Amino acid sequence: MSLRDDSRSDFDSLRPGESTEQGATRRTALKAAIGVGYAAAVMPVVAQTAVSTSAEGLKAGPIKYTVNGFEVPAYAAAPAGKTGLPVILVIQEIFGVHEYIADTCRRFAKLGYLAIAPELYARQGDPRGYTDIPKLQADIVTKVPDAQVMADLDGALAYAAANGGNVAKSGITGFCWGGRIVWLYAATGKVKAGVAWYGRLVGQ
């Protein structure tokens, strides 16, 4: 199976009828995203149904850290003024670090974690402006090498260690494309736990 086919299968797995969690609001929104773009498809749904977690009591927002001379953008959230925090890496879907991913970080922060969501496509492009899924896969997703992603996650842990995180208590979670990344990074032994949301176990 090619990486392109693998990525397409990741996206297809979100459709109702392709998973055991049928009818979920996020999957319905993602199905609608085909051909019209993620942001355009989900914004009406988000406005009506999404939970937005307040940043009150948190230090939350965009960050950057350097990996091999490249500044990796990311979103991070943590309880304000706290140190020695357990760390959770939050891995994007194929659509990048959008508001749902940022909100997931804030929810973890409310529970006492330092949560970091790196923009793992940053070198290849911004997925948020795409309206055609096959083009997104061809232009960006299939051009992101696993080695690059692993290095960027190493960098995220290094950032966490220098900014109030206890990387001896670290985990990783991710969605769709990010679910596969969870399995890959968990296998390195650099995190203590990994939870993948419909991430594939096959592919390059």
Predicted regions and their residues:
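Short amphipathic alpha-helix adjacent to the substrate-entry channel of hydrolases
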Residues: 99-118, 122-123
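N-terminal twin-arginine translocation
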Residues: 23-28, 38-53
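N-terminal secretory signal peptides
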Residues: 1-24
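N-terminal cap/lid segment of alpha/beta-hydrolase-fold proteins
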Residues: 50-80
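Short beta-strand element of the alpha/beta-hydrolase
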Residues: 85-93
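Gly/Ser-rich "nucleophile elbow"/oxyanion-hole loop immediately N-terminal to the catalytic nucleophile
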Residues: 131-173
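Primarily recognizes the serine-hydrolase "nucleophile elbow" in alpha/beta-hydrolase
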Residues: 155-204
